[in-house]
Amino acid sequence: MTESAAAWRELLDTLRELDTSFLEGPRAVTDDRQIADGYRMLATGLGVALDCYLFPEPGRPQFVAVNTPTRHDRRWGGDNTDAYYHMCPIDPERKYRVFGNKGDSVYLSLTAYNEPSPGAWSNKVVAIIRDTDIEFDADGNF
């Protein structure tokens, strides 16, 4: 079996077991609506993971909306009607130029997090640039 095939099967096995987090044990739900919400949450997490880690091109990274108040498939970890979060995995060996427009944002930052081991959640901020560190032109471009 190829490494890709093994990884795919491992993903499917993991997905197959994830619903036990809300179907079994002391936090189990029985209401159809709550069960549907659990599956919706799993699908949302999978969608974010695929968009952030499977589809990006390392040579041309793009920011992916991972939490917005308007996309229902990108509302996870708690709603925040005032914030938009984007993610962009990068190669620590490369340099990047980020440009955009701050729009009507009250606060804007670019934050880099570590990856303690492949696939692990970050546990440390390794760099941050806040809007007070960025030069904007008259139209809000940077």
Language-model features: where?
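A compositional/structural signature for long, glycine/proline-rich flexible linkers
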Residues: 1-142
